[in-house]
Amino acid sequence: MRLNKIILSFVSALVILFSTSVASFAKVVGDKIILGAAISLTGKYSSNGVHTQNGYNMAVDRINSMGGVKVGGKTYKFDIIYYDDESNPKRAAQLAERLISQDGVEFMLGPYSSGLTKAIAPVTEKYGVPMVEANGASRSLFTKGYKYLFAVLAPANLYLDVAIDLAVEKNNGKPVTVAMAFEQDAFSQDVRLGVLDAIKRTGSKKVIDDKLPKELNDMAATLVKVKQMKPDVLVVSGHTKGALTAIRQIAEMKVDVPMLAMTHCDAAKLSKQHGKNSQYALCASQWHKTLTYKDNFFKDGMTYAADFEKEFGYDPPYQSAESSAALLVFKDAFERANSFDQKKVRDALADT
């Protein structure tokens, strides 16, 4: 009996030791800091999912090549485990569970879109896993009291409210009429709320308030009404596919409005895809290469854009740039925390 107890105690000790080792190595394997990310590589958000992944990879390569992350007197390099969330919120939540519970990831990068970020945030919060996200701009993400969710971008309600202000300014300070068409996702609905606030603030009038179809492939019904009612401003938000559909059908149906304000113009590569038909669209953006901000890793926007194009073969949209910024934020937080303890890293992120 005593021998059995000794054997049982020895086995239990091995189990505890093994479990502790797995937990430790999950966050740092040798000299690598393992981050997890569920990204839309297929489905309706796939183009922006690729932009997001490319931005992450660009920053990982740059940080690693410039000395990595210094914690506790040692140097570490970033690595990322990716899974395809298929542009599906349920799948994104499942993959977050997998990354944390099975792969042992203790630090997460966000997905693309507010809807998928909204699906993942409760999972990372439950496990106390810090997540830095770069592409979930919905205001509702930041009103739920999450303590482990951090973002590098401005909220969606600030994307196109300035378009209404500009239209009023160009109308000699007089109110304008506004037509709107929005996707039924968290991001676009927050953009809509910002536009509605601007309409109210300026005394302007909403004359069309339509929902874009789920597949974002046809907005002819809205455009027929626009031709009939002749609003001063047409506002559209439907991610990349919605932007492409809008420009294509506006040209096909010969719709003419004094101002067209949209989201996702650069991600959709409108100027390349639709040429002159995309000219004069007023487009919201979180970043542009001509901005004068500088840092020690990418120098400035023009240099970042040139390096990105050399690596991936196209001019970076803001989704890529803000994704790169998420890695810089994580590096800074790890080094200020001087630890891989999740709570300490979380506190460092909160102080950023």
Specify the residue positions occupied by each region the protein language model found.
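Hydrophobic alpha-helical
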Residues: 114-121, 125, 231-253, 326-327
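Extracytoplasmic ligand/sensor domains, especially the bilobed periplasmic-binding protein
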Residues: 54, 90, 105-209, 258-283
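Extracellular/periplasmic bilobal clamshell ligand-binding domains
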Residues: 224, 230, 328-352
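Extracellular/periplasmic periplasmic-binding protein-like sensory domains
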Residues: 250-324, 335-336, 340
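Extracytoplasmic "Venus flytrap"
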Residues: 29, 36-57, 83-89, 112-113, ...
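Surface-exposed patches in mature extracellular/periplasmic domains of secreted proteins
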Residues: 68-73, 77-78, 177-180, 315-321, ...
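Beta-alpha junction/loop-to-helix N-cap segments that form part of ligand/metal-binding clefts
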Residues: 27-28, 34, 47-54, 66-143, ...
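Short, low-complexity disordered leader/linker segments with a strong preference
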Residues: 1-34
